[in-house]
Design a protein with these regions (language model features):
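Short, well-ordered coil/turn residues at beta-beta hairpins
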Residues: 6, 89-92, 168
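Conserved metal-phosphate-binding beta-hairpin within the catalytic cores
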Residues: 232, 268-290
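Short glycine-enriched loops at secondary-structure junctions
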Residues: 94, 118-122, 233-236, 283-285
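Conserved N-proximal alpha/beta basic substrate-recognition cap immediately N-terminal to
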Residues: 11-29, 33-145
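Extreme N-terminal starter segment of soluble prokaryotic enzymes
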Residues: 1-4
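Phosphate-binding site of ATP-dependent enzymes
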Residues: 19-20, 149-150, 157-162, 170-262, ...
Length: 290
């Protein structure tokens, strides 16, 4: 197969932790032709959607050491039509560029795009968890999204617990995630000044604090709506966020009864939305993010 990965720049890949690198490695190990590129290198020439990509040069031996594989990879620069690929993985960090998705629209009938373009659009930020209609909050923590300061302050004051989680709507990798306390309204106002003031006036998420968050979260990989693996992510000392990018560590994890029930609850909708290959972040059996 000919497989293209639309991703972040190759030079930014951390071979010790990068999940896309591992998918690429497995594709090459299985004998597929693999190309990588960024959305900024998508082009249209004569009504044909193309991309400047780097095609991996096949080598006699493929190292199973990801650091060695990364450092020894060789490429051939090409300008190729996207319709010539059998599969296209969209692996850029969210929020995805809508123009890039428009480029992919033109080849969605020629190549299998992972994930489906419409699915990528509907799940392009943290509002997607609200679409599961978990009215009893059995699987999804109570979540508020707004850029109205009065409303956000009211939510924090009326919260049943003494703290909540504040984060930007379009953040990723744990960036901007902060614990806010009910007793510290003045500090909360200062945070809102940072997040929703100025020209952009971005939306923020104010979410129920799930007990156990300080011990980390669980990243579950799902394929076709079914969990295929999981790892426990443990935050560094003094850190709330468990992301590896913020110093967190990982450990093997066996799904709990509650986590399996969560996967059964969200799996059908993920598939229906065309989200075939996803990672979900879970704390104490509750879905934090897709």
């Amino acid at each position: 197969m000919r497989i293209c990965f639309i991703m972040y720049p190759w030079k930014t890949v951390d071979p010790l932790y990068d999940s896309t690198l591992r998918v690429i490695h497995e594709c090459i190990r299985r004998g597929h032709t693999v190309a990588i590129g960024t959305s900024s290198n998508l082009t249209i020439r004569g009504s044909i959607t193309q991309a400047y990509v780097d095609v991996f040069v096949k080598q006699a031996k493929i190292s199973n050491n990801f650091k060695v594989f990364y450092k020894t990879a060789k490429f051939k620069r090409c300008q190729l039509p996207l319709s010539g690929f059998d599969a296209i993985f969209m692996r850029e960090d969210p929020p995805l560029n809508n123009i890039a998705l428009n480029f992919l629209d033109s080849v969605k009938d020629d190549a299998f795009i992972i994930n489906d373009i419409n699915g990528l659009r509907v799940a392009n930020n943290k509002l997607y968890t609200a679409s599961f209609n978990d009215e009893q909050n059995s699987f999804i923590p109570v979540t508020h999204a707004s850029k109205n300061r009065e409303y956000l302050e009211k939510v924090l004051r009326e919260c049943k617990h003494d703290k909540m989680i504040l984060k930007p709507l379009n953040g990723h990798g744990g960036s901007g995630v902060i614990v806010v306390e009910k007793k510290a309204i003045s500090s909360f106002r200062s945070l809102l000044d940072f997040y929703i003031s100025g020209e952009k006036q971005d939306y923020v998420i104010l979410q129920e604090y799930v007990e156990g968050a300080e011990q980390g979260d669980v990243r579950i990989l799902m394929l076709n709506g079914v969990p295929i693996g999981a790892m426990k992510r443990i935050p560094a000392e003094g850190e709330l966020r468990a992301n590896v990018s913020t110093g967190g560590s990982v450990a093997k994890h066996t799904l709990t009864k509650e986590e399996k029930a969560l996967c059964q609850f969200i799996g059908p909708k993920l598939v229906n939305d065309g989200l075939f290959f996803v990672g979900i972040d879970v704390i104490n059996g509750k879905l934090i993010e897709v």
